[in-house]
Regions:
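Basic-flanked hydrophobic alpha-helices used for secretion and membrane insertion
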Residues: 1-193
């Protein structure tokens, strides 16, 4: 069976109050990040913590019932510690996708087909919208671009980050040394490291 909760982050984005208003989003707790050690997450990602709880670096589990329960919590991302300072509602309707997390036994073929279509729709939202992004300050976004100069793709304030020796997407991170390169088609010259 599939899962309709967020299981990872898909990129970084810098949001401003005007962009939030323009997109019909809203800040439901806290504020937008201003410092380099601050992040905001979407209400869609928040739902994962509401379901599973939050576990701190020292192993202490906290129940998350309200948006503000997550504000002030720390997350370690790429060996850096960030404080969650805000939650942004990116308008993902969790109820629409609930059925894909339910047991498929006893479902009709039509129900399974509908669940499959919904899972593909949700996968697209997770990958290509702001629903699974980490919201950072403009300065932090620029810092990330400097840290990964080999490959940074910006599309409407959405950033994909990669480098010559690391492949990153929302479901896999691997060093080139971990990949069997005989099955790789190099589009811009073979990479050895």
């Amino acid at each position: 069976d599939m899962c309709h909760y967020a299981t990872d982050f898909s990129g970084y984005a810098n949001l401003t109050e005007s962009k939030i208003k323009e997109m019909g989003y809203k800040i439901v707790a806290g504020k937008l990040p201003k410092d380099n050690n601050e992040i905001a997450i979407s209400s869609y990602v928040y739902e994962t913590y509401a379901k599973a709880g939050y576990i701190s670096e020292d192993g202490i589990k906290s129940e998350i019932k309200y948006y503000n329960d997550l504000v002030g919590k720390k997350l370690k991302i790429d060996k850096k510690e960030f404080t969650i300072v805000g939650i942004v509602d990116t308008k993902v309707d969790m109820d629409r996708y609930k059925s894909i997390s339910e047991d498929s036994k006893g479902k009709t073929s039509a129900q399974n087909l509908t669940d499959f279509a919904l899972s593909q729709e949700l996968a697209h939202i997770q990958q290509y919208s702001l629903a699974c992004d980490i919201f950072v300050s403009e300065e932090m976004l620029n810092s990330i671009k400097e840290e990964y100069p080999n490959y940074v793709q910006l599309i409407n304030n959405y950033m994909y980050v990669s480098s010559d020796d690391t492949y990153i997407d929302s479901s896999r991170i691997a060093s080139l040394s971990e990949i069997d390169t005989k099955d790789v088609t190099w589009v811009d010259g073979e990479k050895t490291k």
